[in-house]
């Protein structure tokens, strides 16, 4: 759940590396927080209000006004390059949409996309201890992907173009748990540019410029 996910970046050593109880202690000094926490979650401890309220906010972060969305709903157009990139994205030639499908361009699964360096982070294996999970990470949404560099779970790829080049050659790491769909695609530079153009249409400026999300 999102409530559980909230705990990860707070406590993970390579993210915030902090302690939820220390956050609770600090927030107890804030009379407004204490008042709102009791009002909203009267039967729960303050630390519950922290995770529950952050998760509630995260559920409001819905992006659905990109150029692609307008095109899909008959309210806008894509140019030829973007349209050809869209056709490639949803084609059997690339299989991009196999993992990055649906409204949020993710199937919410875990997968090894050939970017992992096992010695630094073994992925889902850290939790399950199943060898089949070595190098598997959550498939991310591609909405607003043009704005979220650097890419991959470890930030090892600096640009969207480099990501596409990596997939085109079948990944950067041939680990044995790599998804069977990650293989050489043999796309031309022109086709890679078309894919990148399509991915840029997933940017939702109404979402990213919403003043409610600035803080």
Residue ranges of predicted features:
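Periplasmic c-type cytochrome electron-transfer domains
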Residues: 1-215
């Amino acid at each position: 759940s999102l409530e559980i996910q909230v705990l990860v970046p707070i406590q993970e050593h390579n993210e915030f590396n902090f302690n939820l109880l220390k956050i609770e202690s600090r927030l107890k000094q804030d009379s407004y927080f204490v008042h709102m926490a009791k009002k909203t979650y009267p039967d729960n401890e303050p630390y519950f209000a922290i995770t529950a309220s952050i998760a509630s906010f995260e559920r409001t972060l819905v992006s659905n006004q990109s150029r692609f969305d307008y095109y899909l709903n008959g309210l806008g157009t894509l140019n030829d390059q973007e349209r050809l990139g869209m056709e490639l994205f949803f084609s059997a030639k690339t299989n991009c949409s196999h993992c990055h499908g649906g409204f949020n361009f993710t199937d919410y699964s875990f997968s090894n996309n050939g970017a992992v360096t096992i010695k630094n982070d073994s992925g889902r294996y850290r939790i399950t201890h199943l060898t089949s999970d070595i190098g598997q990470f959550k498939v991310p949404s591609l909405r607003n992907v043009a704005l979220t560099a650097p890419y991959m779970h470890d930030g090892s790829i600096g640009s969207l173009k480099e990501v596409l080049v990596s997939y085109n050659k079948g990944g950067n790491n041939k680990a044995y748990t790599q998804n069977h769909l990650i293989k050489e695609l043999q796309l031309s530079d022109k086709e890679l540019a078309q894919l990148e153009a399509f991915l840029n249409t997933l940017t939702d400026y109404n979402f990213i410029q919403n003043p409610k999300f600035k803080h």
